[in-house]
């Protein structure tokens, strides 16, 4: 398949009324040897701030000499935008080869078992597949929507993060902050450390309750780590970061007070990693 054909093929699996659940993802990835279980995954959810937090974390891990896979959504121009290792997007030829492999599964003898597979499930599976085959040191997976039933949530992460909670996708996730927080907290795993960003109290209470039930150690913004704005310089923000593990002054490459919260959370994730 060429670039146009890959776009058309995967777009044909786009739907406005998906059947949510992880069963198809589990079946699909099992047919590919369960690549998602061969990775060290940092799983990031939340309403806003995911992209910036992931970018900060990716850069810091990269400076440590690690090969860092990043899966993000949505794509800007082409599906290659969603899958990258450090600064390099998946090559178009490699993506096309993987799409051919997945097409043979979805349209071949396993078609019945995989009926209802969506565009996002396919590209998520391809990301896991690519990162495993490239043997990245760590894969940062961004939740697409919600968390509990999001197709990224088949992984067994070493670390999870929830950035913020706001009213988004209310028709699917719930019409209250508490209901949405419960969906976002679906990525929390038994005993796996959780870092939370600047989350409103009513939503944080739900997340903390779920984390406690799953015995997940927590690093909470404003409690276990703090950031304080020190001023704007050029195109970035200067802030102090304080936690039991480190204290220091940092500068972001992006303007906006919310960016110091994103950067602070990325530092907390790095120190937990």
Residue ranges of model-derived segments:
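Short functional linear segments
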Residues: 1-46, 52-66, 71, 107-114
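Short, surface-exposed alpha-helical segments at coil->helix boundaries
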Residues: 4, 22, 96, 204-208
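ATP-dependent carboxylate-amine ligase catalytic core
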Residues: 29-37, 63-155, 171, 201
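Histidine-centered active-site/metal-ligand motif
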Residues: 43, 75, 169-170, 258
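Aromatic/hydrophobic pocket-lining residues that form π-stacking "cages" and hydrophobic walls in ligand
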Residues: 57, 127, 207
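Short glycine/threonine-rich catalytic loop with a Thr-x-Gly-x-Asp
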Residues: 68, 234, 254-266
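Acidic, Mg2+-coordinating active-site environments of NTP-dependent enzymes
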Residues: 110-111, 135-142, 157-249, 263, ...
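A short glycine/serine-rich beta->alpha loop
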Residues: 111-115, 251-257
